[in-house]
């Protein structure tokens, strides 16, 4: 029951923290120039988060079990005092097994990232084709862009929730806290980036709040579902296929699609601008480039500070 209480508290903290971080751009009134600057910073945060936090976290989750298993086997051999020639023979067998595991895991990394990216690409195309058929082509693209951006981040947040739920089922408080900190490090900037992008895209404030609420609810809801839905046998099965790492890398692919295909072109003036006579076509000013770079670096600095 203690595990259930801790996962409940972490889920509530995640929901509140994410929503508060996302509401900041809405709570402050920005001029058009300030809003562009905040949007650029948010875009940088999304890109930096995808590259510096989510991909490394996913890779770490994949390799953690293999590395721990290797360490455990060597310590066991030392404790049991196995003869040196026998130990060498066993270790060579294990080395072969581990090299096989590593090649398998390399494949998981690429496949998960690409599938996440392609999934969002297909969702984007299906969404935009539906909108194109019913609406004016001028307004079709940006509206599908908003939906894709939110959907991509929600898919990512749901994968985060699975990771936290799986961590809670290990009954180790330290593991839960590490996963929670890792998730909050990128959920808060992502919420800020999502809201600033939706504001820049000209969405109404009430609808932005709804988008933010869906994004904020995704991870806590999935963490609770994962924790409650995992039986002992399914926990073992999940750990065998490294489901947490695969889920995080899949979501990293969706995150990268959202950050690079939607948010960056929009901010750089290549996408739709709701004010055609603005400076959108000229690209970014020096200050905006500095804000973009700063946004990319913030998650990197935070992730360096956060150690496993």
UniProtKB/Swiss-Prot annotation:
Catalytically driven reaction(s)? Zn(2+)(in) = Zn(2+)(out)
What one GO molecular function would you report for this record? G protein-coupled receptor activity
GO biological process, alphabetically ordered = bicellular tight junction assembly; intracellular zinc ion homeostasis; regulation of cellular response to testosterone stimulus; regulation of vascular endothelial cell proliferation; zinc ion transmembrane transport
Keyword Cell membrane among record annotations = yes
What the entry lists under InterPro entries is as follows: ZIP (IPR003689), ZIP9 (IPR045891)
> What GO terms fall under cellular component here?
mitochondrial membrane; mitochondrion; nucleus; perinuclear region of cytoplasm; plasma membrane; trans-Golgi network
According to the record, which residues are glycosylated?
A: 29, 242
- What membrane topology does this protein have? Multi-pass membrane protein
User: Which Pfam family name is an example for this entry?
Assistant: Zip
Bilayer-crossing regions = 4-24, 35-55, 107-127, 147-167, 177-197, 211-231, 245-265, 287-307
The answer on whether this UniProt entry bears the keyword Glycoprotein reads yes
Keywords linked to the UniProt accession: Cell membrane, Cytoplasm, Glycoprotein, Golgi apparatus, Ion transport, Membrane, Mitochondrion, Nucleus, Transmembrane, Transmembrane helix, Transport, Zinc, Zinc transport
Q: Where in the cell is it found?
A: Golgi apparatus, trans-Golgi network membrane; Cell membrane; Cytoplasm, Perinuclear region; Mitochondrion
The family database entries (PANTHER family) matched by this protein are listed as:
SOLUTE CARRIER FAMILY 39 ZINC TRANSPORTER , MEMBER 9-RELATED, ZINC TRANSPORTER ZIP9
Functional summary from the UniProt entry: Transports zinc ions across cell and organelle membranes into the cytoplasm and regulates intracellular zinc homeostasis. Participates in the zinc ions efflux out of the secretory compartments. Regulates intracellular zinc level, resulting in the enhancement of AKT1 and MAPK3/MAPK1 (Erk1/2) phosphorylation in response to the BCR activation. Also functions as a membrane androgen receptor that mediates, through a G protein, the non-classical androgen signaling pathway, characterized by the activation of MAPK3/MAPK1 (Erk1/2) and transcription factors CREB1 or ATF1.
Q: Which family is annotated?
A: Belongs to the ZIP transporter (TC 2.A.5) family.
Q: What is the official name of this protein in its record? A: Zinc transporter ZIP9
What organism does the UniProt record list as the source?
Mus musculus (Mouse)
